[in-house]
């Protein structure tokens, strides 16, 4: 989520990020970077003693992931109650971007109560299944090939297979039109 928020800021968009941060050097870095690019963290929370979510990606010579290590435990603090307390703010957004590092119950609660359009990033094949019950509540989805295969049930071996996978995703109730699958 932070990478998407960061890049939207760089594109000149007004962005607020609702998240949780730990009490560590990574959180300080996130706050400093957010200030530098104009990313609003007003509706975020600091978890006493918490470790800010981290993700390390190691690419091979071909650019594909060879290894990834993460610590996302802090996102368990983004509960339905955490979201409920911020829902008025969230519902006034032009677009809500969420991802599957959130607990499944929180993702489902958000999708049931959010009146703003929602774009979801599956983030990984391990976490993508959390989106299956809420696909019909989403406005847009940002899967990679493997995540699209998992959520659509369609094997994508060539570029010609992608439209069939997109159709299957739209049949799940994904809102809007063909442009919803980005």
Spans of features found by a protein language model:
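Conserved phosphate/ATP/ADP-binding segment of small-molecule kinases
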Residues: 113-118, 122-182
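Structural motif
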Residues: 94-95, 140
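Histidine-anchored nucleotide/phosphate-binding helix
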Residues: 2-10
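Catalytic beta/alpha-barrel core
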Residues: 97-102, 121-122
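Conserved N-terminal subdomain of the carbohydrate kinase-like
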Residues: 10-94
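Short, small-residue-enriched loops and turns at beta-alpha junctions
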Residues: 73-77, 104, 125-128, 150
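Short, well-ordered alpha-helical microsegments
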Residues: 27, 104-108, 127-131
């Amino acid at each position: 989520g932070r990478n998407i928020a960061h890049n939207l800021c760089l594109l000149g968009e007004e962005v607020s990020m609702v998240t949780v941060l730990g009490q560590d050097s990574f959180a300080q870095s996130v706050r400093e970077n957010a200030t530098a690019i104009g990313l609003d963290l007003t509706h975020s929370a600091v978890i006493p003693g918490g470790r800010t979510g981290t993700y390390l990606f190691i690419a091979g010579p071909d650019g594909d992931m060879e290894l990834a290590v993460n610590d996302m435990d802090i996102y368990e603090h983004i509960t339905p109650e955490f979201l409920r307390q911020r829902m008025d703010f969230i519902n006034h957004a032009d677009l809500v971007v969420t991802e599957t590092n959130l607990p499944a119950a929180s993702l489902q609660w958000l999708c049931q109560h959010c009146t703003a359009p929602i774009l979801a990033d599956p983030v990984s094949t391990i976490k993508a299944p959390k989106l299956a019950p809420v696909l019909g509540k989403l406005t847009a989805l940002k899967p990679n090939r493997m995540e699209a295969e998992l959520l659509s049930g369609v094997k994508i071996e060539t570029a010609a297979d992608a439209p069939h996978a997109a159709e299957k995703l739209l049949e799940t109730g994904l809102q809007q039109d063909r442009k919803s699958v980005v």
